[in-house]
């Protein structure tokens, strides 16, 4: 396979440029529809609604099962396959086909639908227009009031399994790279679970390939996919809006990866229901409830380079000689960037066209029936330290469904969501909003907590001006110190940045970077280099380190010692992790000075970007005495922590959790104080991803009684 990867590019890419003005056609036989506009030719299976083939400039882009939804209507008692837009009626301008299943209230078991079935009817549509370099796909879920209560399963997504010609993966600027060869993955050793493997050969030898390294924030990832260093084509998913997704503007989900079997295919995914980082949402439908949801249209975009830059023989030879830290030809980077930048430009065009005028016959609100919400959010933070700016950094404002009982909005996928970036003075405008009743919400970098205002009603074709809205952030006393700043990620801390956080194994390498754990001095230390983004157990077995690695603590690839397949059976429960995946208790210390004896109530505010394990919370001590634990459940402001799998899945974020630990300020003393944070020994996947820490003091408040002794302290 390596020889194929390194073969000199023929520079033919795909066939000659197609006719962008060709008429669209649609044909059908007993088993499929074929849509063709002279640029792309798609074959859609009847029954399942899957895309069996997508040919672009003579190259088949699909592999394996092609493109498909997690659920499928194919087993519905009533199934119809219809041409919903016939190009014969519009002079070849557009074609659309529909595969619809009516279940009559029975469960709709989809292709591997997790957790059972979906108690809805489902329709899948594909559309192609004249000049479109790609195909639109969308799904319509419908729950009539006479259907039984239920949901849409724990996951719902559109997936494409691609041709092996695609060997370059792109999520964002930091994950824009040559992938491992499929055969190298197939012979790799399972580390802990089937989606984590150590490469024992190839250009990424002595590195771990992990499918969760390629998750992205949906709001910030407008175009992502794969490209080919051989055929010089790309294939991309474009969400023109995230209104039909769920989880808000910080939602992290899988975008691209290899399949996790021994013969993997490149994969692109678009989740509207999913929760790998506990940021996902679900659909809970009651008996008698009428509910409809249109997911998409998503644009599956394909593009090519007519004049790709060739790799030199010297570059190809250098890559062939690489084992662990590949020296990839600069021309391959340039070609991949050109394709990706074109896809990003196309994403802007798709957003400008949203909502699409050609979508008819479903619950899809046209532009003239949508509304706009405007206003200005103003910070009122009188207890903030002097010099704190009232201007916003990275303000994001949105409209969501109201919270419903025990189901907060961030976990509710029944409704639509609308988000936009605000300005530094707090002004915002949310356009193209479907009519309905919403809650206005806002997040901002540097501001702890979030803003919410209920009962915002949007009417068809109208603008709602909410005027000036006051946001009073969470704060109960004067600030004694802080570490970092709140932005719902760990990216500001050491190795938490986008160039590093997605790489597998920082929970192992913490022991190499900080052999004596962390001591942080307020006023002297720098959170950007002295505070690691994860606090995890301290690895005690360093046998995972490749003895030939130049800088195993810092280098991107090639720092793990490759193992033999014979040593570790290929199962989800065994592997090298059983040997080096555990560590001792980790204690981090924060030192700070106070000028005098304090009294009143102290508030330790902690925002966590991710949590794994820690059933009893994150133990906190002060001057040698335990004062409780973050997330111990003893106070409504200190609820128990929720596992997000962020450490296991190589992420700097997940469900953001903000907790407050209150204690008697008399425990503070004049001069030097030491506060400790303890993660118990155990699995290296347990611990926290830090977002922000702040200590406040209210001299006039009555202090809480001392907490019970916590075993993590």
Region locations from a protein language model:
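A contiguous, surface-exposed recognition patch within enzymatic or periplasmic domains that forms
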Residues: 161-293
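Extended, loop-rich substrate-binding clefts of extracytoplasmic carbohydrate-active enzymes
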Residues: 71-146
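Beta-strand-rich N-terminal accessory domains
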Residues: 14-68
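Beta-strand-rich ligand-recognition modules
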Residues: 422-425, 572-599, 607-707
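Short, acidic Ser/Thr/Gly-rich low-complexity loop/linker segments typical of extracellular
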Residues: 404-427
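A short, amphipathic beta-strand motif
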Residues: 371-382, 426, 469
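A short, solvent-exposed beta-strand micro-motif common in secreted/extracellular proteins
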Residues: 426, 436-446
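Structured interaction patches on ligand/partner-binding surfaces of diverse proteins
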Residues: 445-474
């Amino acid at each position: 396979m390596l020889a194929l990867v390194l073969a000199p590019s023929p520079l033919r890419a795909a066939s000659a440029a197609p006719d962008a003005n060709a008429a669209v056609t649609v044909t059908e036989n007993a088993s499929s529809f074929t849509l063709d506009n002279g640029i792309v030719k798609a074959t859609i299976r009847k029954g399942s609604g899957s895309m069996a083939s997508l040919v672009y400039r003579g190259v088949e882009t699909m592999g394996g099962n092609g493109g498909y939804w997690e659920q499928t209507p194919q087993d519905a008692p009533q199934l119809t396959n219809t041409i919903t837009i016939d190009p014969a009626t519009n002079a070849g301008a557009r074609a659309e086909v529909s595969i619809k299943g009516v279940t009559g209230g029975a469960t709709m078991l989809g292709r591997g639908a997790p957790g059972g079935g979906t108690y809805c009817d489902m329709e899948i549509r594909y559309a192609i227009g004249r000049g479109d370099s790609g195909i639109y796909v969308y799904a319509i879920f419908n729950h009539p009031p006479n259907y039984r209560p239920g949901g849409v399963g724990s996951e719902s997504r559109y997936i494409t399994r691609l041709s092996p010609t695609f060997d370059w993966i792109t999520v964002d600027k930091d994950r824009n790279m040559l992938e491992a060869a499929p055969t190298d993955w197939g012979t790799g050793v399972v580390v802990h679970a089937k989606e984590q493997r150590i490469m024992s050969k190839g250009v990424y030898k002595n590195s771990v390939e992990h499918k969760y390294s390629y998750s992205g924030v949906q709001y910030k990832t407008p175009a992502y996919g794969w490209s080919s260093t051989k055929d010089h084509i790309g294939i991309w998913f474009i969400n023109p809006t995230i209104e039909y997704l769920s989880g808000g503007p910080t939602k992290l989900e899988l975008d691209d990866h290899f399949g996790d079997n021994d013969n993997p295919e490149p994969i692109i995914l678009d989740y509207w229901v999913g929760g790998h980082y506990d940021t996902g949402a679900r659909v809970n439908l009651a008996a008698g409830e009428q509910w409809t949801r249109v997911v998409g249209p998503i644009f599956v975009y394909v593009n090519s380079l007519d004049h790709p830059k060739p790799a030199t023989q010297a570059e190809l030879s250098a890559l062939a000689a690489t084992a662990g830290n590949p020296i990839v030809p600069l021309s391959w980077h340039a070609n991949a960037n050109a394709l990706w930048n074109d896809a990003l430009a196309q994403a802007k065009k798709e957003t400008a066209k949203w909502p699409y005028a050609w979508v008819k016959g479903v619950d899809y609100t046209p532009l003239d029936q949508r509304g706009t919400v405007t206003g200005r959010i103003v910070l009122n933070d009188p207890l903030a330290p002097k010099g704190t700016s009232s201007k916003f950094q990275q303000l994001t404002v949105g409209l969501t469904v109201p919270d419903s009982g025990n189901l907060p909005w961030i976990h509710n996928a029944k409704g639509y969501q609308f988000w936009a970036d605000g300005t530094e003075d707090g002004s915002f405008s949310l356009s193209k909003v479907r009519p309905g009743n919403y809650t206005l919400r806002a997040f901002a970098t540097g501001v702890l907590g979030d803003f919410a205002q209920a009962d915002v009603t949007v009417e068809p074709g109208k603008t709602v001006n909410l005027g000036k809205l006051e946001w009073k952030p969470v704060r109960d006393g004067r600030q004694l110190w802080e570490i970092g700043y709140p932005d719902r990620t760990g990216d500001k801390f050491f190795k938490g940045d986008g160039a590093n956080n997605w790489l597998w194994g920082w929970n192992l390498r913490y022991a190499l970077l900080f052999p004596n754990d962390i001591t942080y001095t307020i006023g002297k230390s720098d959170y950007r280099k002295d505070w690691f983004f994860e606090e995890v157990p301290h690895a005690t077995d360093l046998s995972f380190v490749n003895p030939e690695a130049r800088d195993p603590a810092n280098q991107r690839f090639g720092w793990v010692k490759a193992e033999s397949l014979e040593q570790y059976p290929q199962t989800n429960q065994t592997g090298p992790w059983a040997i080096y995946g555990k560590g001792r208790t980790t204690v981090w210390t924060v030192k700070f000075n106070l000028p005098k004896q304090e009294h009143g109530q102290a508030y330790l505010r902690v925002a966590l970007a991710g949590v794994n394990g820690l059933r009893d919370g994150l133990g906190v001590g002060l001057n040698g005495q335990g004062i409780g634990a973050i997330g111990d459940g003893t106070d409504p402001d200190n609820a128990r922590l929720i596992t997000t799998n962020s450490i296991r899945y190589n992420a700097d974020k997940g469900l953001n959790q903000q907790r407050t630990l209150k204690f008697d300020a008399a425990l503070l003393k004049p001069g030097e104080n030491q506060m400790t944070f303890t993660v118990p020994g155990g699995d290296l996947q347990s611990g926290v991803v830090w977002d922000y820490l702040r200590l406040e003091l209210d001299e006039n408040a009555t202090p809480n009684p001392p907490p019970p002794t916590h075993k993590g302290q």
